[in-house]
């Protein structure tokens, strides 16, 4: 979504294309994190409500710790944990976990 926006593609149009192709997934057709694409999701309410980033961080910690104990690498899980830790340290942990897109946008 962020790439599309940087190419001046309307987010609603891009979501429509994604959702009628093999790119369709839960985060694009049910819980889109990009503001203005869907109604009745946290991104339409300033990322209020929903499942908090702090709870996502807790769950990722449990998953990464379990993987470490069983000696299974979870590279992307560990990276996600670090990103949610950064989000939480910036005081954004009470927001819905989909607000991670705002953190991602700061890296661009």
Regions found by a protein language model. Name each.
Residues 1-108:
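Helical "substrate-binding/catalytic lid" subdomain
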């Amino acid at each position: 979504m962020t790439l599309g926006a940087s190419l001046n593609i309307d987010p609603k149009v891009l979501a429509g294309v994604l959702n009628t192709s093999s790119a369709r997934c839960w985060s694009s057709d049910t819980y889109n994190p990009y503001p203005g694409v869907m109604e009745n999701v946290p991104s339409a309410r300033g990322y209020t409500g929903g499942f908090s980033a702090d709870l996502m961080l807790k769950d990722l910690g449990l998953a990464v710790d379990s993987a470490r104990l069983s000696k299974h690498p979870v590279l992307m899980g560990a990276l996600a944990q670090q990103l949610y830790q950064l989000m939480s340290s910036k005081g954004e942990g009470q927001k819905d976990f989909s607000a991670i897109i705002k953190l991602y946008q700061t890296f661009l």
